[in-house]
Amino acid sequence: MKCREIIEILETLAPKSCACDWDNPGLLAGRMDKDVEKILLTLDADDAAVERAKEIGADMLLSHHPLIFKPVKHVSDEDFIGRRLVSLIQADVSYYAMHTNFDSAPGCMADIVADRLNFVDQKPLELMGELSGTAYGIGKTGTLKKPMTGPELAREVKNRFGLPFVTVYGSELYENEPVTRAATCPGAGGSEIREALRAGAQVFI
């Protein structure tokens, strides 16, 4: 399959128009007409991921966080961004990133997290727009299908996502009281805390 065809599939799933204005998703290096048989998925296009892609003979590297956010004035091996780009291009590995568009698009990260936690009455935490009549945005807010205490919810999150542990701040607030409304954000989430409070969330995940 051509790189172009894979990108068409990815952008049908998570259109670049769903990304935040400051973001930079898309094909960041490589050839559109590249024949792709093997893809390496990674959170970050760091040195280890780039070397691993070359080691396994990957034709395409797909990351969540873009390697390039700001305009690049030069590409050389004198800085970490240039070094990785040069390495990928020399190895003929096409590099694509899908970040906040994948976080926010309908059916993607925000929906997956909320569905796995059985949220009802789901709404985008930060509304960004509509796609085919469906509202989308960063994060989700909703009512828990079954009220539970803070510790119970922490265990639910841990189990639902197969995590070795979770970190809880303010655990004493709902230690013995039921949580009925929660909000999630598939990222750092610092800028969404106020939105979570406005939405009436008792817990922010």
What kind of region is each of these model predictions?
Residues 1-205:
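Hydrophobic structural segments
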